[in-house]
Amino acid sequence: MESSSPAMSVAIAVLAALLGLTGFGVYTAFGPPSKNLDDPFDDHED
């Protein structure tokens, strides 16, 4: 098998990092850690 090019390795690394950050953001927004998030609109009654 031919060794992969450096560009393909970098592209896969960037894609993995973006998918990881997206997954972490969704988990933080909708998973169990979301119970600790504050809603700024509820904090300021008009």
Curated annotation (Swiss-Prot):
Task: Name any one Pfam family assigned in the record.
Answer: PsbN
Question: Which UniProt key words apply to this protein?
Answer: Membrane, Thylakoid, Transmembrane, Transmembrane helix
Q: How does it sit in the membrane?
A: Single-pass membrane protein
Q: Which InterPro entries match?
A: PSII_PsbN
- Give compartment(s): Cellular thylakoid membrane
Q: A single GO BP annotation from the record?
A: photosynthesis
Q: Which GO terms describe its cellular component?
A: plasma membrane-derived thylakoid membrane
Q: Where are the transmembrane segments?
A: 10-30
General function of this protein: May play a role in photosystem I and II biogenesis.
User: HAMAP family annotated for this entry?
Assistant: PSII_PsbN
Q: Which family does it belong to?
A: Belongs to the PsbN family.
UniProt-recorded name of the protein: Protein PsbN
Q: Taxonomic lineage of this organism?
A: Bacteria, Bacillati, Cyanobacteriota, Cyanophyceae, Synechococcales
